[in-house]
Structures are given as C-alpha cells and as structure tokens.
Amino acid sequence: MDILLVLRAILYRLRQGCSWRTLSIFGHWETIYGHWRRWVDMGLWEQILAEFFMRARGKLWGIDSTSCRVHKHAFGGVKGADYQDIGTSRGGSNTKIHALCDAKGKIIDIFLSPGHRHDSNYAELLCDDVPKGITILADKAYDSDRLIQFLKERDVKFCIPSKRNRTSARKVNKGHYKKRHHIENAFQRLKEFRVIATRYEKHRENFLGIVTLGAILAWI
C-alpha cells in the first residue's frame, strides 16, 4: 500500500476522530493500522519531535498539563487502566498530557500520565534536557523545593509563582509569566484533533503516538 495514502488515512483519522475500521475507505484498514503500529513501536514520532526540540526558539519555555476525556472504548488494555495511563478524577476517567513548549508555543516534549497524578511529578522529566539559560514558565502547581533545586542545579532559570503556604513568596517577573499563554494555546491546538480531545486508544503507546503526531503537525 502506498505510504502517502497511509499517511493521508492517519491524518484523516486524527482530524475526524473515527475508528480505525472506518479507514477502509482508503484501503485495507488492517494494513494502515499495521503501518501505524510499526511506526509507534519504532518510536518514529518521538524521534521526529526530538529533531524539532533542537530547533526550539526563544528563552521562555513553558510546562503544563491538560486532561483528555477517556472514551469507554479505551478501556480493556493489558495490565489495567493505570498502566495504560488512564486515571479517575472529579471529571471522570481521563489521561493527562504533560508538555514542554518553546517561546513560540510549539510543543517539543510530551509525557502521558493517569489523570489523577499531580503535575509536579512529571516536571523533572519535561525539564531534563532543557539547556542552560532557558527560563521555565509554570503555574504554582509546579512550586516545589525539589523542582526548584533541580532547575538550579542545571543553571535553568524559572518563573513559578509561590504557593500560599510558602513562608516567603518569591518575586515573579509578571511580563515573563504572561507568556504562559503559549502553552495553553498549544494545548488548544492539540485538542482540535478529535482523537486527542477524547482518547479512544486502549494502548498508551498508540495515544502517545497520536498526541506526538499532533504536536509535530504544528511545526509543519
């Protein structure tokens, strides 16, 4: 099957939110899905996004998370919901997307977690490859001694408001902090894709691949 046709089918599903079987309008849906799974298993989408990481622009980068509702068809994956990054919070069953974006609002790194996990648990993963001299913008949910120390050890600056329980609140550059809207806008663009706004995938690798592909398309 022509690879360009396979890509067209995958992009069609990304935008329409249809099932894999619906892609039979492009050819054998099993063949299309087979290509997709091979690319996911190869880590192809993560490799491509890593290339864009090297092209990240500006000095003010942001980290944040957003929750995606989980459709009932996404349940039943091997090893249970938690292993598949599906959790339960007030809003019901959901998966969290944790992301790092550059100063232009382009996502350059992504992790998934069950919806009930706290954002700060994934901050170090997102910031692990951030180069010296970059300023990380984040809301007060990320205010933790551990993360602050982690960033300082790497000579990475930060603009993170203090939580109320801080005995002494740190000063925050309000002009810098306003730039946090870039990552919020990035999440809005991601959720324009129906299969990201609502998770239909049973397997976390499939959903991570879809989210990563959505982030890549913003660069193209």
Name what the model sees in each region.
Residues M1-I220:
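Short alpha-helical elements
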